[in-house]
Amino acid sequence: DSGTVYLFYNSEQIDRVSYLEDWQFSLLDNSDGVSLERISPNASSNQQSNWHSAAESIGFATPGRVNSQYQYVGTTESISLQKDVFSPDQDGFEDILVVNYAFSESGLLARARIFDDFGREIKTLFSNELMGTSGFFTWDGVNGDQAKSPIGIYVLVLEVFSVDGGVILAKKIPFTLAGKL
């Protein structure tokens, strides 16, 4: 799809963008329902490089919210856990592992996997997922066999790469799955 969008304020045109379907992320199988998001309000509206497909991790759209591909000035790559201990016992207190991220560029893909203390992969959270420039994802403690993982030490391995396969970031973050004994 292609078209032109006009922005008016008090009947005066203040901005406009003419876009083409090939502005969507090139590795999407289907761009139907995927929003194009402006990366920076400071760059030209008609500059193709200032637009990117909304991140898969937020449902390919951000109506009423900050764009998933919005570029924060001064952002550098960062990955952090909200807490390094969680207890998925449904008591309403730290039941999920929350992983926050921020990247300095848009259009990055990522793979997130969980390993146990013996180095065995127990769960792939996602693979080749188009990420926003900032956001979070979670793990509920359920392993690849759809069973609750046992109490112990685990490692999150997050690999972030560009479309051409270049590794942007590879990080291992240890954390603890706690519970009642």
Give the residues covered by each predicted segment.
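Short loop/turn motifs at secondary-structure boundaries
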Residues: 71-181
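Intrinsically disordered, low-complexity linkers and terminal tails enriched in Ser/Thr/Pro/Gly
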Residues: 1-90
